[in-house]
């Protein structure tokens, strides 16, 4: 027992050190200013960034307000750093809707529309002021419909008319993904804009499976084998590339085969603003250093945007677990 007690501080220190090392690998900076400074090295090589303020769902109104302030400060900082580069060439921000309201669920639909939507609109107008892209992050499947309703309302705001910086994230492991793309294409047509759509494979697989089992559902909302998700991803990529006037595709993948397939699907007549690849900070840079850059330097001359989490090591755990599962 004495040996056990004396070992506790050592174990604690070891865990803390491990978390810090992992944090340095996966987090761009503890503050947005630090993250912007750390990003310059890869920006000089042609990479772009989309920043995300780390943290999970808000549990109280105070949490939601703190996240709101954090996002506002980040947009101001990113906007100044962008210096007029625009939504395609400059940095952007990703926001999580569950961080903006403690009751973000279908059961609280009216409250969400009344209380969360004004916050989303306010952040989007601020992003427009600086002309930086703002992406609404994907979450669990039971929040998909409400997030699409919020997006639709946003797309028809008169103050945002004609601006193409609104973005939305879709997950290829969701069985509904191709149908969601059809809806987004229709929404872009009706609202007369070009939407930025980030296609990811999906990071909530374990919780989606467990939730479906606990609820006694007949089937799962997500594919149960990775190979199905890989095929779905390419099918969805093809749909996104087919409507370049309505969709700006952002292909987030660390899979070299998927990357090569999209490179071929998109054709060789690339033009700036056609599409971009994306990767997570600390995970995809070695692959994309072969992609981003001039053909004369042996690269593919295709843009890559790095998804860059910002936050302290205390806020890292949930994000880190998802990355380790990947």
Predicted regions and their residues:
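Positively charged, amphipathic and often flexible ligand-engagement surfaces
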Residues: 1-326
């Amino acid at each position: 027992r004495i040996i056990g007690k004396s070992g506790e501080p050592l174990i604690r220190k070891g865990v803390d050190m491990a978390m810090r090392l992992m944090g340095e690998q996966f987090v761009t900076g503890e503050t947005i200013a630090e993250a912007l400074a750390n990003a310059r090295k890869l920006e000089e090589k042609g990479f772009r960034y989309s920043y995300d303020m780390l943290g999970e769902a808000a549990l109280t109104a105070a949490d939601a307000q703190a996240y709101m302030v954090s996002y506002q400060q980040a947009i101001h900082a990113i906007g100044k750093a962008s210096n007029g580069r625009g939504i395609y060439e400059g940095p952007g921000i990703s926001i999580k809707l569950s961080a903006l309201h403690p009751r973000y669920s279908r059961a609280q639909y009216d409250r969400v529309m009344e209380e969360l939507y004004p916050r989303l609109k306010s952040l989007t107008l601020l992003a427009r002021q600086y002309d930086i892209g703002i992406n609404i992050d994907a979450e669990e499947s039971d929040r998909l419909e409400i997030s699409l309703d919020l997006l639709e309302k946003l797309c028809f705001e008169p103050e945002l008319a004609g601006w193409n910086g609104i973005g939305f994230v879709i997950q290829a492991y969701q069985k509904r993904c191709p149908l969601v793309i059809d809806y987004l294409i229709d929404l872009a047509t009706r609202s007369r804009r070009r939407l930025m759509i980030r296609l990811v494979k999906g990071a909530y697989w374990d919780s989606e499976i467990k939730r479906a089992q606990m609820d006694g559902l007949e089937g799962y909302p997500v594919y149960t084998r990775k190979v199905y998700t890989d095929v779905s991803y390419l099918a969805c990529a093809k749909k996104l590339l087919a409507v370049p006037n309505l969709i700006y595709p952002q292909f987030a993948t660390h899979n070299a085969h998927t990357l090569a397939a999209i490179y071929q699907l998109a054709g060789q007549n690339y033009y700036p603003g056609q599409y971009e690849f994306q990767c997570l900070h600390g995970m995809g840079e070695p692959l994309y250093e072969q992609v981003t850059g001039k053909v004369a330097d042996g690269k593919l001359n295709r843009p890559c945007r790095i998804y860059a989490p910002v936050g302290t090591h205390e806020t890292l755990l949930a994000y880190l677990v998802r990355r380790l599962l990947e």
